[in-house]
């Protein structure tokens, strides 16, 4: 098989966008596939694709190709401000189709449809429209050359009518090698809540932080990207207290946080974006056997409720306070 990524395969795991490509590559290898890897700089990808063409001309067969999209448009996925008009990745998809190699891609996100370009990339209105046009160009190419798009959830397709080809849900998975969670707090005077994830206008957790500040029996650890916190700190500064810790960790550094928590929180203010987006941390909480507190009418909340792995609540301080108090008084709810 062929594994394609339009840039250097990320080695950091600060977010789902950096964690998933490497995990998928490892999964294919563990399944026994002989993987032809195409990634790296533009020149690296050109060289590897030329080598691939030579192998195919020599008679080598490939079952299929799988690609992971970047969170950036393909033409600027290397981080350059100006597009790479070499279009090497688009030409790769075209070549696969000509050769009869079915190509599927995991299409990561459509945050760009929800006014996040100015916040995430620091773009003004004109530049935002320009970058959106590059995202739309991606979809045109995918429709023309790919066999299937894998999406985080089926609901994402409803928000993306530009997708004309077959699409299937492929949400984040579980790493069964991770350590399972064991409750071992001798001091049960506090209920320890962990929030791991981004903070933005589409990921607002003010009711969670506000509730923790109100009650002495609650303790909250927020683990988020350093740049997200620098941007969003003003929103939450009035809620901060000595029972709310903010840290910036990733990868294996997260293990002690999971081990020391009683609950994993995905308690966001609901919005259209959250109704179809599956949080990577939802599945990482599950890996570590943490009960999950999520918001009703979000993808995470629906998943938690249907699988009975925690609590799915309206985004209301009163309901949240009542539930957390009940859990604190009877910790058997955590089992």
Residue ranges with predicted function:
Residues 87-102, 113, 122-148:
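Membrane-proximal helix-turn-helix segments that form the acceptor-binding/catalytic region
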């Amino acid at each position: 098989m062929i594994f394609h990524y339009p840039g250097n395969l990320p080695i950091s795991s600060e977010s789902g966008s950096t964690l998933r490509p490497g995990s998928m590559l490892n999964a294919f290898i563990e399944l026994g596939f002989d993987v032809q890897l195409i990634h790296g700089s533009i020149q690296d990808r050109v060289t590897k694709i030329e080598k691939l063409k030579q192998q195919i001309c020599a008679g080598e067969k490939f079952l299929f190709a799988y690609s992971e999209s970047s969170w950036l448009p393909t033409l600027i996925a290397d981080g350059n401000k100006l597009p790479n008009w070499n279009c090497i990745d688009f030409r790769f998809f075209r070549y696969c189709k000509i050769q009869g190699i079915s190509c599927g891609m995991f299409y990561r996100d459509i945050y760009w449809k929800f006014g996040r370009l100015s916040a995430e990339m620091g773009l003004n209105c004109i530049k935002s429209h320009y970058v959106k046009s590059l995202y739309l160009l991606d979809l045109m190419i995918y429709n023309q050359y790919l066999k299937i798009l894998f999406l985080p959830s089926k609901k994402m397709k409803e928000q993306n009518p530009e997708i004309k080809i077959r699409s299937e849900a492929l949400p984040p998975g579980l790493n069964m090698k991770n350590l399972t969670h064991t409750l071992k707090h001798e001091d049960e005077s506090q209920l320890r809540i962990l929030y791991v994830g981004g903070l933005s206008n589409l990921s607002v957790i003010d009711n969670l932080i506000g509730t923790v500040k109100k009650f002495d029996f609650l303790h909250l650890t927020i683990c988020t990207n350093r740049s997200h916190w620098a941007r969003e700190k003003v929103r939450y500064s009035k809620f901060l207290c000595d029972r709310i810790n903010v840290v910036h960790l990733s990868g294996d550094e997260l293990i002690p946080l999971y081990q020391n928590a009683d609950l994993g929180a995905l308690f966001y203010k609901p919005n259209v974006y959250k109704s179809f987006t599956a949080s990577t941390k939802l599945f990482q909480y599950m890996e570590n056997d943490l009960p999950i507190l999520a918001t009703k009418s979000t993808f995470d909340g629906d998943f938690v409720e249907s699988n009975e792995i925690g609590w799915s609540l309206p985004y209301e301080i009163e309901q949240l306070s009542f539930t957390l108090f009940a859990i604190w008084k009877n910790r058997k709810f955590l089992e």
